[in-house]
Amino acid sequence: MKLRNTVATALGAFALVLALPGSALSATGDFTYKYVTGLGHEERVTLHDPHSGKCINLYAVGDDDVPAGYGPHNRTDTSVTVYRGSSCTGDQWRLRAHGNPATDQLEVRSVRFDAPNS
């Protein structure tokens, strides 16, 4: 009976850990960029608390067959690498955490955020 209670407690604790929010794997804050729609309108997209450590192809510009986004602004708590190509390929630049907006000449299709500092 003691073993059964120990196993049940361990499984319950494991399930609780899995249910915790994934904020430990995300940057905290906002990352924004701009792009021009097919109708010629400038739009701004915001990623709120984006995932860290994995490549993110950006909405509306993450395909090499469409015009790139531009003017990225990293207001998260981690540095980010922005890529001119999709799937985190091509020319790349680093933007600091809580940085100033980049110039509109800086094109972006995909990004990868650093892991947050503990």
Indicate residue ranges for each PLM-predicted region:
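Compact beta-sheet-dominated domain cores in extracellular/mature segments
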Residues: 2-118
